[in-house]
């Protein structure tokens, strides 16, 4: 799937096949979830599938003009016999939106606090946040946008530095064993994306494996060890998230809920705290 996201590695026949194969896996997962939850298929009204993004085209001015997600909805519908809704991102872009992040409406429905603002932070490949007003606030609107790289640069660096022996920093061990290069970190935080006002979205097209490999080379030129490089890129994710809160939060959140793979990285979580 990751190769399908990289120009020069992706092939149209692979993308075509993945579109159906991913749907088979998603259908099996949906059926397993229904069973574990104690429901029958006929009791489920619908399945919503946003698919697997392989390309999200963001222009220099921040406008999103195209996007492509895999996971064939027809396969999901056939395998589960449940009405399936898809193409959420494409519809949002067609209506003039950014196509991401998509979780903000579900966050709004399920995760508002009775009395204070709450931040819901995903740290997947890319980080995104939803700022939610409290239930007691009937006036304020939520805000959601991509904060920048989540795990993507860390994973790319670890993969490159270990020759593929590791594809992510398990338990944050490399970051915890390294030293953050504060001067380099400060320069990395000057990327124009971080200053751009929401609504905004980004992806592997900007913060991707190619950038990760280049940053490894930059770190090596600075005389940094592999652990120092990973520590600094981990700090980049943490600081870009914290800076986004300081700059753009409609109100100071009383708490943050963190999910995604980054939430299982002790080094990253410690930096965020």
Regions found by a protein language model. Name each.
Residues 1-16, 139-142:
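Short glycine-rich, Thr/Ser-proximal phosphate-binding strand/loop in the N-terminal lobe
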Residues 133-135, 147, 156, 239-273:
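Catalytic phosphate/nucleotide-handling subdomain of diverse soluble enzymes
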Residues 52, 125, 261-263:
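Active-site metal-binding loops of divalent metal-dependent hydrolases
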Residues 139, 143-238, 242:
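Conserved ATP-utilizing enzyme core subdomain
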Residues 40-43, 114-116, 225, 249-254:
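Short helix-loop-beta connector
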Residues 9-70:
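Short beta-strand-loop/turn "lid" adjacent to the catalytic site in phosphate-handling enzymes
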Residues 25-33, 226-252:
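Phosphate/ATP-binding catalytic cores across multiple sugar-kinase/actin-like superfamilies
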Residues 58-67, 78, 82-166:
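Phosphate-binding/catalytic loop of phosphoryl-transfer enzymes
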């Amino acid at each position: 799937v990751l190769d399908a996201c990289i120009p020069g590695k992706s092939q149209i026949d692979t993308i075509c096949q993945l579109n159906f194969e991913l749907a088979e896996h998603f259908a099996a997962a949906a059926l397993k979830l229904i069973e574990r939850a104690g429901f029958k298929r006929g009791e489920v009204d619908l399945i919503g599938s946003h698919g697997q993004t392989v390309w999200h085209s963001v222009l220099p001015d921040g406008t999103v003009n195209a996007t492509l997600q895999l996971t064939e909805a027809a396969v999901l519908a056939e395998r589960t016999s449940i009405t399936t809704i898809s193409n959420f991102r494409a519809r949002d872009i067609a209506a003039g939106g950014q196509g991401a992040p998509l979780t903000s409406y579900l966050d709004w429905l399920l995760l508002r606090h009775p009395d204070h603002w709450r931040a819901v932070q995903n740290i997947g490949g890319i980080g995104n946040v939803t700022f939610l007003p409290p239930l007691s606030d009937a006036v304020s609107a939520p805000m959601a946008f991509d904060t920048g790289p989540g795990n993507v640069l860390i994973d790319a660096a670890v993969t490159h530095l270990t020759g593929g022996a590791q594809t992510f920093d398990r338990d944050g061990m490399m970051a915890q064993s390294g030293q953050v290069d504060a001067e380099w970190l400060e320069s990395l935080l000057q990327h124009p994306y971080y200053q751009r006002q929401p609504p905004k979205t980004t992806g592997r097209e900007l913060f991707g494996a190619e950038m990760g490999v280049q940053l490894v080379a930059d770190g090596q030129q600075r005389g940094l060890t592999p652990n120092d490089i990973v520590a600094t890129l981990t700090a980049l994710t943490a600081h870009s998230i914290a800076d986004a809160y300081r700059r753009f939060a409609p109100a100071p959140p009383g708490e943050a809920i963190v999910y995604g793979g980054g939430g299982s990285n002790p080094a990253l979580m410690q930096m965020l705290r």
